[in-house]
């Protein structure tokens, strides 16, 4: 849908199980978690971040339906409802760090994940400096589940999506079609 009209992707009944890695490992959720994903329900990220893996992990899912994004609203919700985990595109974090975070009690927030676009290292650094929280990047598609991620046991490297999800074999290809060596850039 990001390059044209939305396209249908069929999944079978096993698809939700593929999100165990998303909810339990990448989002780092558990039974005491209150998780918010900022995603429209028409986007594949909604089932990624609001439903399958999160419920499998036993987390409570906080759903907020907004017609227009206001960063102060997100910060107020984190404060008022004691949200512990947040997943959003990097653009959301770009707007959050423009707010005066000292006006909000974000002490309940323990873990943040990002997906949907590349993360600017400056946004990562600013958010971490202001909150003490690392932004854990992930990559996947509607047709798959979480394919590459920075998992809780890893130290994030701004500009790197992380490592392959153990559920997948991932190969990065150079422009000539051969596999990229460790440290080389390539296409998934």
Each model region followed by its residue ranges:
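Conserved AMP-binding A3 loop
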Residues: 1-17
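Conserved S/T- and glycine-rich ATP-binding loop of Class I adenylate-forming
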Residues: 1-2, 35, 78, 86, ...
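Short beta-strand-to-turn element immediately C-terminal to the catalytic PLP-Schiff-base lysine
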Residues: 10-12, 148-152, 173-174
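Conserved AMP-binding/adenylation subdomain of ANL enzymes
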Residues: 14-34, 41-84, 99
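Thr-Gly-centered strand-to-loop micro-motif
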Residues: 37-38, 63-65, 113-115, 161, ...
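Gly/Ser/Thr-rich phosphate-binding loop
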Residues: 56, 83-88, 97-157, 169
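Short Gly/Pro-enriched turn/cap motifs at secondary-structure boundaries
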Residues: 159-165, 179
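Conserved beta-loop-beta connector loops within the AMP-binding
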Residues: 171-188
């Amino acid at each position: 849908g990001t390059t044209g009209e939305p396209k249908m992707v069929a999944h079978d009944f096993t698809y939700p199980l593929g999100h165990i890695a998303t909810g339990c490992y990448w989002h780092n959720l558990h039974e005491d978690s209150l998780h918010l994903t900022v995603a429209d329900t028409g986007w594949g990220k909604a089932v990624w971040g609001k439903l399958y893996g999160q419920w499998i992990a036993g987390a409570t899912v906080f759903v907020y339906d907004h017609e227009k994004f206001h960063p102060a609203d997100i910060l107020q919700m984190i404060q008022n409802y004691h949200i512990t985990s947040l997943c959003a595109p990097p653009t959301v974090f770009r707007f959050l760090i423009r707010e005066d975070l000292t006006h909000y009690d974000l002490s309940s927030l323990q873990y943040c994940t990002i997906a949907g676009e590349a993360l600017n290292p400056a946004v990562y650094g600013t958010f971490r400096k202001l909150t003490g929280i690392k932004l854990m990047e992930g990559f996947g598609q509607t047709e798959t589940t979480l394919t590459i991620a920075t998992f809780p046991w890893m130290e994030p490297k701004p500009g790197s999506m992380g490592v392959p999800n153990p559920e997948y074999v991932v190969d990065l290809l150079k422009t000539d079609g051969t596999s990229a060596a460790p440290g080389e850039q390539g296409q998934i």
